Amino acid sequence: MRFVAGDFYAGLVEGQHLDAVYRSPGLSPYAIAPVLVAAHVTGTRASGELGLYVQALDALRTARGYAPAVLAITGTNGKTTVTSLTGQLIEHAGKSVAVAGNIGPTLLDTLSAHLDSNTLPEVWVLELSSFQLDAVNAFEPTAAVVLNVTQDHLDWHGTMAAYAAAKSRIFGQHGLMVLNRDDPAVMAMLPEPVKVKLQRPQVRAHITFGTDMPQRPGDFGIEEVNGMVWLVRALEADETR
C-alpha cells in the first residue's frame, strides 16, 4: 500500500491502473475534484462507504437471497434521535434490527459483525449524513426520510442547493419518500408527476408529516382535542368503513 501526502491531483489516478477509488466522507468534493474527474475520465469506479454497503447487500442478495428492509434517515437536525427511536420501535415490534451509519457504529463494521455472528437482521435503520450521501448513486432504500434542511455544512457543499441535493440522494429512484411538509426545501425533493398516455400522471410514492392536520390519505399530522395533542393519520376512504 502506498501513502501519499499533500494535495489531491489527477496523477493519483491517471496511469495507476486502479480498480476503484474510495473516498472518505470527511473529504469535500471540491478538495478531491481532480481525483474524481480523473476517475470518471479513466472509467475508474468512484465510491464511498455507503456504496460499499450497497455492493455488499447486492452480493448477499445474489448469494443468499438476503433482502432486508432498509430504512434511511437524514436531516440537518434530529436524525440521530429519530434513528435511535426507529430502531427501538422495530425491535419492540419483534423484528431483528441493526442500527448503523452516522450514529455509529459504521455501516461496514456493523455488517461485518452480523456476518461473523450469522445474525443478519430483518431491518436496517441507517442514519446518513450529507457527506455520506454526496458520493452515492445506486442506493435504493425501502423507505427514507429527510427530516429538515437548514443552513449547515456550506463550507463542505458550497451552496444550499448542493447541500439539499446531497440530502435528496437518500431516496434513490424507487423507495417510499417520507417528507416534512412544513419544510419547503424537503417538499421540493418530490419529483414532478410523470405524464402517462391515457392515464393520470403518476406521482412518486410518498407520505408526509407535519404539525398541522393531515389532508392527504396516509399522511401524518398533529391534532389538539380538549387540551390533548394527538399524532393522527389521514385514512383512506375504505379504511373508515
Locate predicted features.
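Glycine-rich, highly charged phosphate/nucleotide-binding loops
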Residues: R2-E14
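Internal gly/pro-rich beta-alpha loop/helix module
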Residues: F3, M189, P193, H206-F209, ...
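Short beta-strand elements of ligand-binding domains
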Residues: F3-G6, S47-L50, T208-T211
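Phosphate-binding loop of NTP-binding sites
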Residues: L12, Q16, P25, P29-Q202, ...
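Basic, alpha-helical nucleic-acid-binding regions used in initiation and control of genome expression
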Residues: A20
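Short polar/acidic secondary-structure junctions
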Residues: A138, M213-P214
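Short, surface-exposed charged micro-motifs
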Residues: D219-G221
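A short, charged helix-loop
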Residues: A237-R241
